[in-house]
From Swiss-Prot:
Exopolyphosphatase activity is stimulated by NH(4)(+) and K(+). Phosphotransferase activity is insensitive to the addition of K(+) or NH(4)(+) ions. This is Exopolyphosphatase. The keyword Membrane applies. It comes from Pseudomonas aeruginosa (strain ATCC 15692 / DSM 22644 / CIP 104116 / JCM 14847 / LMG 12228 / 1C / PRS 101 / PAO1). Degradation of inorganic polyphosphates (polyP). Releases orthophosphate processively from the ends of the polyP chain. Also has polyphosphate:ADP phosphotransferase activity, catalyzing the production of ATP from ADP and polyP. It is found in: Cell membrane. Its EC number is 3.6.1.11, 2.7.4.1. One of its GO terms (cellular component) is plasma membrane. Belongs to the GppA/Ppx family. Keywords: Cell membrane, Hydrolase, Magnesium, Membrane, Transferase. Its cofactor is Mg(2+). The gene is ppx.
Length: 506
């Protein structure tokens, strides 16, 4: 199929868009919807282990058996994209098909099954798309990221900042190819592991210096192998989901002691990943040692998410979380004028009480800003208990760019913007718990202040915050002339007593 002949229609104009990633180890499908704000909302994810790379012979021809495994998987995927128009589906193939001398035969047959063109992308293009997927799935760290993705036949390295990758490399080492080379019979010995590790270190020598010269502030892993390692280390009690040298060393000892892939019955390692796990672990250890990494975090977003965002064509330098919040407001028909009023007042109050209440962190400001903008999304469901509806929507939605913890905190902020503040739930965040209670109080104040939704100009007030109290002084005689506001704040004082805070209004 001729890619140039595909209609150049904006992705958001399609009811659905899809990305297929034909990897060396697994095939993946993501079905999504894009909107005019550039947000991609994942509707369905499918993945199957195909191990295409295991079907490459010494002459780099793909076996008929491996080809059939791939085509059988694509036939199942085809049911999801049947009838989708040209331009709404992008199919990319990576290392195994880059290497296969007879790839044209597989591609022809795959296109007949799918009805859409298959692109074999270069290692560096793969790296670019991986980075795009990561950047759109994690909060902007403010500095450079090093992203590593251990695939079945290759491993990609990208350094970038914001939504732009600056350096992209692809090395010929992967968990399937190294399994074929060093762990073919499933036996795990120190000697074999050392061979795999050394081979990876030799591959890395060619790019170590260029990566170090550019530098990075955060290391991110974006593959199933890295996710499995992180889960296994966490299950073993060595961290909270991040990967560290100590955690890797513990896991390596554990794997070598077990000695056989059939015995790798460890939490986090799925049965269908056991055969390739030792090879992936050796590659990851080599990456840590070669680049002297102290920590790596895992990103759920990677190649297929990058393909979707590339299909949409949105590459602005922006915090993806801002785009997500804007999309929530649109989706649930939030009144933008009221949201803007509440946000402006909340941020003004934060500036006044931030020092006294230790709310000077960037995340505090972000959470308050986001909470002010989306606190009314539950109204789109029903007015009764709308704060609970809104909290549920935030907690259980896929919010691009948000960490799970940030999403939970935002959900509780929305839950606590009226009636009872969920202090017991907020307390689960340890020392941040009381600060989150204070953020709730700030947001609630801003909402009460604009309860009349802009129908009346509100006065300037003086605020004084103490550890367990907030004093508010209105202009003389104003409250008496505005009994609704007076009643609102009297009721609010009763709610705040329940969480140990006093509200003094005069």
């Amino acid at each position: 199929m001729d890619l140039q002949s595909m209609p150049q229609k904006p992705a958001e104009a399609f009811p659905l868009i899809a990305a297929l990633d034909l990897g060396s180890n697994s095939f993946h499908l993501c079905l999504a919807k894009a909107n005019i704000h550039g947000e991609v909302r994942i509707l369905e994810r499918l993945g199957e282990k195909v191990q295409l790379a295991a079907g490459l012979d010494e002459e780099r021809n793909l076996s008929e058996e491996a080809t059939q495994r791939g085509l059988d998987c694509l036939r199942r995927f085809a049911q999801f994209i049947s009838g989708m128009p040209q331009g709404s589906v992008r199919v990319v193939a990576t290392n195994a098909l880059r290497e296969a001398r007879n790839r044209s035969d597989f591609i022809r047959r795959a296109e007949e099954v799918l009805g859409h063109p298959v692109e074999v992308i270069s290692g560096r293009e793969e790296a670019r798309l991986i980075y795009l997927g990561v950047a759109n799935s994690m909060p902007d760290s403010g500095g450079r990221r090093l992203v590593s993705d251990i695939g079945g036949g290759s491993t990609e390295f990208i350094i970038g900042q914001g939504f732009e990758s600056e350096l992209r490399e692809s090395l010929q080492m992967g968990c399937v190819s190294y399994t074929q080379r060093y762990f073919r019979d499933g036996k795990i010995t120190p000697a074999r592991y050392a061979q795999a590790y050394t081979a990876a270190r030799l591959e890395l020598m060619g790019i170590e210096n260029s990566l170090r010269r550019l530098g990075w502030q955060q290391a991110v892993g974006a593959s199933g192998t890295i996710r499995a390692v992180a889960l296994a280390i966490k299950a073993g009690g060595h961290g909270n989901g991040e990967i560290s040298p100590d955690g890797l060393a513990w896991l390596k000892r554990k794997v070598l002691k077990l000695g056989d892939v059939e015995k790798l019955d460890l939490e986090g390692i799925k049965p269908d990943r056991r055969t390739i796990f030792p090879a992936g672990l050796a590659i990851l250890e080599a990456i840590f040692d070669a680049l002297e990494l102290e920590q790596m975090v895992h990103s759920e977003g990677a190649l297929r998410e990058g393909v979707l965002y590339d299909l949409v064509g949105r590459h602005q330098h922006e915090d993806v979380r801002e785009r997500t919040i804007s999309s929530l407001m649109q989706r649930y028909h939030v009144d933008p004028e009221q949201a803007s009023r509440v946000e402006a007042k909340a941020l003004k109050v934060l500036a006044e009480v931030g020092d006294a209440w230790e709310l000077n962190g960037e995340l505090h400001r972000d959470l308050l800003s986001w909470g002010a903008r989306v606190h009314e999304i539950g109204l789109d469901i029903a007015h009764y208990h709308y704060h609970k509806h809104g909290a549920y929507l935030i907690e259980h939605s896929d919010l691009a760019g948000f960490s799970r913890q940030d999403q939970q905190m935002l959900s509780l902020l929305v839950r606590g913007h009226r009636r009872n503040i969920p202090a017991d739930k907020l307390a689960e965040f340890a020392e941040e718990g009381d600060k989150l209670v204070r953020l709730c109080i700030v947001l609630r104040f801003a909402i009460l202040f604009h309860h009349i939704r802009g129908t009346q100009e509100m006065p300037s007030v003086r605020l004084k915050a103490e550890p367990k109290s907030l004093s508010v002084t209105f202009p003389e005689g104003w409250l008496e002339a505005n009994p609704l506001t007076q009643a609102d704040f009297a009721q609010e004082a009763e709610w705040l007593k329940r969480v140990g805070y006093s509200l003094n209004v005069r």
